[in-house]
Amino acid sequence: MSSLTQLPQWQALQTHLEENRSVQMRDLFDQDSQRFSRFSLQQGELLFDYSKNRITAETMARLLDLARAQDVEGWRDRMFAGEAINETEGRAVLHVALRNRSGRPIRVAGEDVMPAINQVLQQMRQFSEAVRSGAWKGQSGQAITDVVNIGIGGSDLGPVMVCEALKPYHQPGLSVHFVSNVDGTHMAETLKGLNAETTLFIVASKTFTTQETLTNAHTARDWLVAQLGEAAVRKHFVALSTNAEAVSAFGIDTDNMFAFWNWVGGRYSLWSAIGLPIAIAVGFEGFMALHDGAYAMDEHFRTAPLASNMPVIKALIGIWNHNFLGAESFAVLPYDQYLHRLAAYLQQADMESNGKYVTRDGARVDYTTGPVLFGEPGTNGQHSFYQLIHQSTRLVPADFIAAAHTHNPVGDHHAKLLSNFFAQTEALMTGKTAAQVRQELEAAGLHGAALEALVPHKVFDGNRPTNSILVRQFTPYTLGQLIALYEHTIHVQGMVWGINPYDQWGVELGKQLAKKILPELTTPGEVHSHDGSTNGLINHYKAWLAE
């Protein structure tokens, strides 16, 4: 048995759950006219409403006791202090330093990292402004019209999500594209229609050895060189890396290499040089506004008492829903089309961080950790998987996200969008009783056996937990707040679960086996070095390829 489930604070929550299993949220609202104000928090122009959860004041008090028992404040402070809280890799966790706007020193092993951060930011400012203004010329003397970011994982998902979310702030005439998949289709389709003379490639790989990224980078290089010659590489490629030797060997001028550090995890790296495509797309001031929003949430997280600390409260609500109410998944549902890549970004941020079954001291857990995260923009999801959220046997907590102001005030579109945003959380909470269904069916002219046969199908149990996040408008600043809110939520949950959210050993085994299999695919003859299924699949592939 792990120590977490033996804690008196954990067992007190278990007892509290048993005593309150029959609690209905609609009754809690009826009993407390101030429930919304009691269970909501605002930070700047971001409102977080968690009142539509199966919680009472006692639930929150007991969850906060658990957070204190797991030293959530201490782990938070150690992270901000630059201590090596990523123990398995012996590294500090300092994405917060990248957006530190206070000017105060942040140290790793006694060294203030802020001068190096500011130096790279200045380099990014100069380069992004040169590209945006047209001062940066390609080999033929033309300005850049298309930027292609080549990366994968954290070198792709964050920049893609932010660039899509901030499309209203993009510079006209300058397009940003992203290639991540080693499937040649991704690169081939991206290059279609691009003009080599006006295309800039950003190769994002800390080690400059990532298989997928370097495969795509060499394909892009071949495409460019075939049209413009070898000398063009220096004008049309830049690198986000720390491996100057490999960058230079590729043909990239190391003056155009943007560094970052091993205390920046990939899934937290959009704030670093990895964010260069963001700075080019929305301008460096927009990139800094993104940092400003994140910094505001950082300071709130760092200084607010636990009971009014938005990331802490959000994390504890998740602990309650997953570890005590039994939810295994979690939906992120942005009612904003610009946020259509948010769920994909958060899948990596959350599932790669907290998808662990071993604690920091190497013991197997006997409780659930990170949930399966999924999502789609509203209202698309309503016509897809919301049926399961409303009426299935599974409990699926959800975050609903929306902005009061739209960037595209077309007719009454936004009012209709937001009416669905508000309606869905109400429906999930209140449900619909059999008596209400009968009344509706009778009003529609249905009676007797036909009515009774339909009633069970139209009943909604309700009592489904949701959070609502409402911002005034999605800007670089408020997007920065939102991202940092999720980052710190993930951190707190990892600390409560006693796991390390900052390593990702689970991605290594498949990569190791792929390296072994790759030469087998081109070696003549059948393969017999794996299990029966894998051998059969490889040999079938080779037979079809040989036809």
Curated annotation (Swiss-Prot):
**Compartments, record wording:** Cytoplasm
- This entry's Enzyme Commission designation comes to 5.3.1.9
* Catalytic activity, as annotated: alpha-D-glucose 6-phosphate = beta-D-fructose 6-phosphate
Where is the chain membrane-spanning? none
Per UniProt, the enzyme's principal EC class comes to: isomerase
* Keyword Cytoplasm (UniProt): yes
Q: Which GO terms describe its biological process?
A: gluconeogenesis; glucose 6-phosphate metabolic process; glycolytic process
Q: A Gene Ontology CC term for this entry?
A: cytosol
Q: Write out the catalytic residues in the record.
A: 352 (proton donor), 383, 511
Q: Which UniProt keywords apply?
A: Cytoplasm, Gluconeogenesis, Glycolysis, Isomerase
One of its Pfam families is PGI
GO MF annotation: an example: monosaccharide binding
Domain of life, per the record?
Bacteria
Give the protein's function: Catalyzes the reversible isomerization of glucose-6-phosphate to fructose-6-phosphate.
- Name the protein family: Belongs to the GPI family.
Q: What is this protein called?
A: Glucose-6-phosphate isomerase
